[in-house]
């Protein structure tokens, strides 16, 4: 935080949730998936489906996040979302032999859907 305090990031939940999201036995409905930690803007948002671009921007602004060249939180989010396909490609190329493809696919496809959603909410 700007006051020098540490807070945990809610993003660690995302990777662990994607492999089990879905419908049917042994799966977690995407409509019910909740983060262990809320994304906090003006209010706390726990459900993954309810967290919108504006909530991330509010969180960043609340904590004084600016880019290295004074980019706004919205600009940083746009840059991250636009670069996501390249990052996914690089990750796929670096996966160790034998890494379970269903796990990688669910995480990386979920990441791309999240990036697309951020860009659509412009």
Question: What are these model-predicted stretches?
Answer:
Residues 1-122:
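Anionic ligand-binding catalytic core segments
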């Amino acid at each position: 935080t700007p006051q020098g305090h540490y807070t945990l990031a809610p993003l660690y939940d995302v990777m662990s949730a994607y492999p089990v999201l879905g419908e049917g036995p042994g799966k977690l409905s995407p409509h019910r998936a909740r983060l262990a930690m809320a994304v906090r803007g003006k209010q706390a948002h726990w459900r993954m489906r309810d967290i919108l671009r504006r909530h991330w921007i509010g969180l960043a602004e609340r904590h004084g996040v600016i880019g290295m060249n004074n980019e706004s939180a919205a600009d940083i989010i746009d840059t991250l979302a636009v670069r996501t396909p390249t990052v996914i490609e690089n990750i796929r190329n670096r996966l160790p032999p034998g890494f379970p493809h269903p796990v990688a696919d669910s995480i990386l496809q979920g990441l791309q859907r999240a990036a697309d959603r951020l860009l659509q909410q412009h």
